[in-house]
Amino acid sequence: QYAVARVEGIVTRGGVNRELLRREVHDNPSVLELSDPLERRLALTLLRFKAVLEDVELDYRPNVMTSWLYDLASCFSSFYDALSVLKADGHKRTTRLVLSDLTGRTLRQGMELLGIRVPNQM
């Protein structure tokens, strides 16, 4: 829940319009630059979401989801602690904002599937 609140804080402090950000990336995916290993690690962790959902559904094991959500939140914390999101320039800023936004949405969706309420701020 803390990671979701942190993402909301980034978006609010940065005055980010999520719809414009998503549209920009959809229209021009080349703006994403995964140049840092922490960016790549977070992106790869996010890409596992579909497989995690399939595992949970196949085996009826919600603990798979809770474990993966913990891993995602930990991965995001490492990313956030080491890399500036709002102070980054150009494509780096866009990439980091997109990764942050997607992390927040994915954590929220995973927790809601488990019946966990997710606050926007702590």
Question: Which sequence ranges carry the predicted segments?
Answer:
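Non-catalytic interaction-recognition regions
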Residues: 1-122
